[in-house]
A protein has these predicted regions:
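Active-site cores of enzymes that catalyze phosphoryl transfer or operate on phosphate-rich substrates
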Residues: 197-219, 285-337, 341-348, 649, ...
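Extended, charge-enriched "interface" segments that sit outside catalytic cores
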Residues: 48-241, 257
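Flexible, glycine-rich loop/tail regions that form catalytic "lids" or insertion modules at the edges
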Residues: 94-101, 108-143, 230, 452-454, ...
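Cofactor-binding active-site loop characterized by glycine-rich and histidine/acidic residues
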Residues: 258-422, 426, 631-683
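Subset of Sec-pathway N-terminal targeting signals
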Residues: 2, 7-48, 54
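Phosphate/oxyanion-binding active-site loops and adjacent basic polyanion-contact surfaces
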Residues: 234-245, 324-336, 368, 432-436, ...
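Active-site pocket-lining segments that scaffold enzyme catalytic pockets across diverse folds
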Residues: 223-282, 590, 599-618
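Conserved phosphate-handling catalytic cores of large alpha/beta enzymes
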Residues: 401-410, 419-455, 459-465
Length: 943
C-alpha cells in the first residue's frame, strides 16, 4: 500500500527548510569525518544517491579553499611556451598517485605499532618520494589528490605526503588493499583518510576510556597483591582489550544487536569476566581460594569457565555469553560460531544483525593452529556463516617462551592467515587507547555493513611470564629489561589527559580509588550491568535437567500420519527432472510407504527426520556429502537434471514447519564438528547431526571429541544432544575405510556422559534418531552406522516396526530356536551379525543363539540379562567382533558382559572371537580380509 502524504511529510520533517543549516553542517562534518556524526545520520548520508561515475562529495569549505588555491596558482597554471612543462607535470602526477597507493598498501610496515619499540623493520623503498621520480623540489608543487580522501582535490606534495604518513604510519597499521571488492576498499579509504587515522573524541569518551583502563589495571594489581604467584594469566600489558570490548558491545548495541557470544583463551579471561561481563568479584575470589562450585562433577580451572550476563546499550539490552573452553588453543572459535548460528536461527536472523560472534586469539596460536584456517574458511559458506566475526588478536609478541619471528611463523604478521578470505586487518598499538577505540569502531561498522570477518591485531606485551609463577627474563632478557621500565597504558593515557586538561590529577586518582573500593566490597564493577535481565534473551534448559538415560519416551508414530508424511516427503515439483537411478529410489520408497516393499535404511532414516519435523523439532544435518549420502542411500536433496537446481522435500512438508537444514560441508572435520557441538549446546529442541564421510576420518576432530563432546557436561555442566553418525564396518576396503575407532569412544565413556549405539536395522536407526530428540535427556549420541547393510537383503524392517516399536538396546535371537537346546550364545554388534546369521543358517547350528548389542554405552546390563534368561542350558558365551582384539568393544566392554554372564550362570567364562591384535584397524588385501573374516566367524561357533 502506498504511504500517505502525511506519513512522507513526517518522515522528511527533519529535512525542512528551517533545519537546512543544521543538516548541512552535519553533512559538512560527515564529509570530513564520518565517525563524528551520530550513527543514524551516518547511515542516512551513506544512502544518499550518487550519480554514476561521480566522485565522492566534497564539502563547501573545501570548494572555497580550492578557488583560493586556484587564484594563488593562476600564473603557474599557465605554461610559458611549450607543452613539455605540462607533460612533465602529468608524469609526476602519475608518480604522486603511485605514491598514494604505495602508502595504502605498505604504510603499515613503518607504522609505530610496538609499545616496546623493539620491532625494527626497514622502511620499504616504495614509501620514499625519490622512488617515484619526485624530489624535494616538488614538495611545494600542487598535484591532484585523486581519490585520496583528504578533503580537497588538489594539494601540494608536502601536504599529500604528510596526510599519508599521518593516516597510515602512526599507531594504526591498516591492511585492506588485498580486498577484491572495490566498495569495501573505498569504504576504508574514506573512513581512514578523512580523519587521517585519528578522529577527535569528546572529553566524555576520553574519560570513559580511562575509566575502563583503570578497571583493567586495577583488577590485575588487586589479584597480584591478594593472591601472589597464583596462576591467572593476567592482561597486564594488554589492558586496552577492556575498552575495546566495551566499545564493541555498546556500538553493536546501537545497531540493534541482541546477543554477543565471545570465545577466548586464558590470557585476560578473568579480567574480561569481571570488567566486561560483570561477574561478581567475590565469586572470582572464591575460585582463587579453591571453593567448589555446587552442581559440577569435576569442574575446571577458573580461566576456562564460561559466563553470561545482560548489559544495557544505547540500542537496548544485550545478552553476553562467554563460551567455556579447554586449554587447547583456538578450538573454541568454531564452537562460538556454531552457538551464534543457532541463536541466529532461533531468532530467524538470516542476515546476522541480531547476534554477533567475537573471538579473541593469541598471536602464537592464531598463526600456528590449523583450526584457525578452517574457521576462516567456513565464514562465508552457507552452512556455517554467521554474518561476520570480529576477531581480536592479543598480540603480546611472545608465545610462552618463543618470540623470535623466524621460530613463531613464516608470515610477516601473525594475522596473515586472515588474508585468505580477504578479511581486513588492523594492527594497532595497544598503548594508544584512542587508536584502539577508532579501530574498534571501524570493525563494528564494517562487520555490520558488509557482514564479513575483520581482524584487530592488538599489539601489546606481557608484563609478567606466561603465568604468574613463571620467570620470563631467562628466555627473553632484552624484552623484559624494556618491560621493567615501561609505564602502564593507563599511566601513559592519564598523563595525556591531564596535560591536555581533559582531567585533573585528583579525578584520575579518584577513578583508581573508586575501583579499588568496589573490589574490596565485592561489588559489581560494570556500570551497564542489568541486575534483572530480560529472560526472553535466554533459552530455558530446565526441561532437560535431571534425567537419566533410562528416562521414559515414546517414539511410536501413527500409521496413517506416517504414510501422509511419506507422500509429502517423496513429492517432486512438476517439471523437476531427477536422475534415473534416483527416480527408481523414490518409486521404491513409495512402495515402502504403502507396505508393498520392505523398508530399507535410507527410507527409515529420512522418515525419522520427517516425523520429528512434524512433532516440532528442528533438524540440522551437516557433513561431507550428506545430501546424497556417501554411499548413495539418503537422497534427501534432489538435483534437477535440466537446470541443476536443488529441491529438499523435507523442507516442504507443511506450512510453518520447523527448520530442516541439510548442508554438504567443506572438507573439514575439526572445525565442522566443533561448530555442530556449539550449535547443539545452544538449540536443545533440535536434532543436530554430523555425519563423517567414513567413520575413520572423525579422528581429525579428536580434540573436539575429547575436550567438548565427552567431557563438557562433566567439566562445565554443558548439556549437548549432538548426534554423530560414523560409517563403520569391515568390507575389505583397507585400514582407512573400515573403522570408526569404536574403542576410542568406549574408552572415553564414564558417568553416563555419552551414548554409543550400533544399530543394525532400519527400524533401529529410525527409533534411535527419534529417541535422541523426543527423550528429554540431552547427551551426545555416537552412532556407528553401516555401509554394506544399507542395501543388505536381510537388513530391512516393516511399517509396523516403525509405528509400534521402540529402540532396542539388545535384540534377542530372531529365529525360532528352542531356548532349552541352546548351548552357546554369541553376542555381537554391527554388520558381523548378518555374517554370523548367514553362517548359522547355512550350517544348521540351531544350538547357537545370536544376540545383538545395539547400545554399548550406557551398557544395558538389565536388558541383556533379560534376553539371556531363557537360555538356562548354555555352556559357552562368546563376544564376536570384526575389529582386532585391541580395538572394537572387547577391552572396554568385556567387564560389563562378564558381569551379566556370571550373574546368569556362575561357571560361564566369556570368550573372544575376532581378529588378532593389530597396529592398523584392517588389512589392505582383499584375500587376507576374507581369510580373517571366515576365521573369526568360525571361532565364534567353536572357540
Amino acid at each position: 500500500m502506498q504511504e500517505s502524504v502525511m506519513q512522507r511529510m513526517w518522515d522528511s520533517a527533519h529535512l525542512s527548510g528551517g533545519n537546512a543549516a543544521y543538516v548541512e553542517e552535519l553533512y559538512e562534518l560527515y564529509l570530513h569525518d564520518p565517525n563524528a556524526v551520530p550513527e543514524e545520520w551516518r547511515t542516512y548520508f551513506q544512502k544518499l544517491p550518487v550519480s554514476g561515475g561521480a566522485a565522492a562529495d566534497v564539502s563547501h569549505s573545501t570548494i572555497r579553499d580550492h578557488f583560493v588555491l586556484l587564484a594563488k596558482n593562476q600564473r603557474r597554471a599557465q605554461p610559458a611556451s611549450a607543452g613539455s612543462v605540462s607533460s612533465e607535470h602529468e608524469k609526476k602526477q602519475v608518480e604522486v598517485l603511485r605514491l598514494i597507493q604505495a602508502y595504502r598498501m605498505r604504510g603499515h610496515q613503518v607504522a609505530q605499532l610496538d609499545p616496546l619499540g623493539l620491532q625494527q623493520r626497514p622502511a620499504p623503498a616504495d614509501l620514499a618520494i625519490n622512488n617515484y621520480a619526485l624530489t624535494d623540489a616538488d614538495l611545494d608543487t600542487v598535484f591532484r589528490t585523486g581519490d585520496l580522501a583528504m578533503g580537497k582535490d588538489q594539494a601540494t606534495l608536502r601536504e599529500i605526503h604528510q596526510a599519508l604518513q599521518e593516516t597510515y604510519c602512526r599507531t594504526i597499521g591498516a591492511e585492506f588493499t588485498h580486498i577484491v571488492d572495490s566498495d569495501q576498499r573505498n569504504w576504508f579509504l574514506q573512513r581512514l583518510e578523512s580523519v587521517r587515522g585519528r578522529p577527535s573524541f569528546s572529553p566524555e569518551i576520553k574519560s570513559h576510556l580511562l575509566e575502563r583502563l583503570t578497571a583493567a589495571e586495577g583488577l590485575e594489581k588487586y589479584l597480584g597483591t591478594k593472591y601472589p604467584g597464583t596462576k591467572r594469566f593476567g592482561l597486564e600489558g594488554g589492558e586496552s582489550l577492556i575498552p575495546l570490548l566495551d566499545e564493541i558491545i555498546q556500538r553493536s548495541g546501537s545497531y540493534g544487536t541482541k546477543e554477543i557470544v565471545i570465545g577466548m583463551a586464558h590470557r585476560g579471561r578473568l579480567n574480561v569476566l569481571v570488567n566486561t561481563f560483570g561477574k561478581n568479584p567475590r565469586d572470582l575470589f572464591d575460585e582463587f581460594e579453591g571453593k567448589k562450585v555446587e552442581g559440577l562433577s569435576s569442574g575446571d580451572v577458573k580461566y576456562h569457565q564460561g559466563f553470561s550476563s545482560n548489559v544495557m546499550t544505547p540500542g537496548g539490552e544485550i545478552h553476553l555469553a562467554m563460551a567455556f573452553n579447554p586449554s587447547h588453543l583456538e578450538i573454541v572459535s568454531p564452537v562460538v560460531e556454531g552457538s551464534v548460528r543457532a541463536r541466529q536461527d532461533r531468532r530467524c536472523d538470516a542476515v546476522g544483525d541480531k547476534v554477533l560472534p567475537v573471538t579473541i586469539h593469541g598471536d602464537a596460536a592464531v598463526a600456528g593452529q590449523g583450526v584457525v584456517m578452517e574457521t576462516f574458511q567456513m565464514s562465508q559458506t552457507r552452512a556455517y556463516r554467521t554474518g561476520g566475526t570480529i576477531r581480536i588478536v592479543i598480540n603480546n609478541q611472545v608465545g610462552f617462551t618463543t618470540n623470535k619471528q623466524e621460530d613463531a611463523r613464516s608470515t610477516e604478521y601473525a594475522t596473515d592467515v586472515a588474508k585468505m578470505i580477504q578479511a581486513p586487518i588492523f594492527h594497532v598499538n595497544a598503548d594508544d587507547p584512542e587508536a584502539v577505540l577508532f579501530v574498534t569502531q571501524l570493525a563494528v561498522d564494517y562487520r555490520m555493513q558488509f557482514k564479513r570477518d575483520i581482524v584487530i591485531d592488538l599489539i601489546c606485551y606481557r608484563r609478567r611470564g606466561h603465568n604468574e609463577a613463571d620467570e620470563p627474563s631467562g628466555t627473553q632478557p632484552l624484552m623484559y629489561q624494556k618491560i621493567a621500565k615501561q609505564r602502564t597504558t593507563r599511566e601513559l593515557y592519564a598523563d595525556s589527559l591531564t596535560q591536555s586538561n581533559v582531567l585533573d590529577n585528583e579525578r584520575v586518582q579518584a577513578k583508581v580509588d573508586e575501583y579499588r573500593a568496589a573490589l574490596d566490597n565485592g561489588l559489581h564493577v560494570v556500570k551497564s550491568l542489568v541486575k534483572e535481565p530480560n529472560k526472553e534473551l535466554f533459552v530455558d534448559w530446565r526441561p532437560y535437567l535431571g534425567h537419566t538415560w533410562t528416562a521414559r519416551y515414546d517414539t511410536r508414530f501413527e500409521l496413517k500420519a506416517l504414510q501422509e508424511l511419506s507422500s509429502k516427503m517423496l513429492a517432486v515439483p512438476e517439471g523437476f527432472v531427477v536422475q534415473r537411478q534416483v527416480s527408481k529410489i523414490l518409486e521404491d520408497r513409495q512402495k515402502m510407504g504403502a507396505g508393498a516393499l520392505a523398508i530399507n535404511w535410507g527410507y527409515a532414516e529420512t522418515l525419522a527426520y520427517a516425523t520429528l519435523l512434524f512433532e516440532g523439532h528442528p533438524v540440522r544435518i551437516s557433513g561431507q556429502d550428506v545430501g546424497r549420502g556417501t554411499f548413495s542411500h539418503r537422497h534427501a536433496a534432489l538435483h534437477n537434471q535440466k537446470d541443476g537446481s536443488t529441491y529438499i522435500p523435507l523442507q516442504h512438508l507443511y506450512e510453518g514447519q520447523p527448520r530442516f537444514d541439510l548442508y554438504d560441508s567443506f572438507l573439514s572435520e575439526e572445525a565442522v564438528l566443533a561448530f555442530e557441538y556449539g550449535y547443539a549446546t545452544t538449540m536443545p529442541n533440535a536434532l543436530v547431526v554430523w555425519e563423517a564421510q567414513f567413520g575413520d576420518f572423525a579422528n581429525g576432530a579428536q580434540v573436539v571429541i575429547d575436550q567438548f563432546i565427552t567431557s563438557g557436561e562433566h567439566k562445565w555442566g554443558r548439556l549437548c544432544g549432538l548426534t554423530m553418525l560414523l560409517p563403520h564396518g569391515y568390507e575389505g576396503q583397507g585400514p582407512e575405510h573400515s573403522s570408526a575407532r569404536l574403542e576410542r569412544y568406549l574408552q572415553l565413556c564414564a558417568e553416563h556422559n555419552i551414548q554409543v549405539c550400533v544399530p543394525t536395522t532400519p527400524a533401529q536407526v529410525y527409533h534411535m534418531l527419534r529417541r535422541q530428540a523426543i527423550r528429554p535427556l540431552r547427551k551426545p549420541l555416537v552412532a556407528l552406522t553401516p555401509k554394506s547393510l544399507l542395501r543388505h537383503k536381510l537388513a530391512t524392517s516393516t511399517l509396523e516396526d516403525l509405528t509400534q516399536g521402540s529402540f532396542l538396546t539388545v535384540i534377542p535371537e530372531v529365529d525360532q530356536i528352542d531356548p532349552s537346546k541352546v548351548e552357546r550364545v554369541v553376542m555381537c554388534s554391527g554388520k558381523v551379525y548378518y555374517d554370523l546369521l548367514d553362517k548359522r543358517r547355512n550350517e544348521g547350528r540351531e544350538y547357537i543363539a545370536i544376540v545383538r548389542l545395539e547400545q554399548l554405552y550406557p551398557f544395558p546390563e538389565d536388558d541383556l540379562a533379560e534376553v539371556l534368561a531363557p537360555y538356562q542350558n548354555i555352556k559357552n558365551i562368546v563376544w564376536c567382533q570384526e575389529e582386532p582384539m585391541n580395538q572394537g568393544a572387547w577391552y572396554c566392554s568385556q567387564h560389563h558382559m562378564r558381569r551379566v554372564a556370571v550373574a546368569h550362570k556362575k561357571e560361564l567364562f566369556l570368550q573372544y572371537a575376532g581378529r588378532e591384535a593389530s597396529a592398523a584397524p584392517a588389512v589392505g588385501y582383499a584375500s587376507m580380509h576374507a581369510e580373517q573374516q571366515e576365521k573369526l566367524l568360525q571361532d565364534a561357533f567353536t572357540v
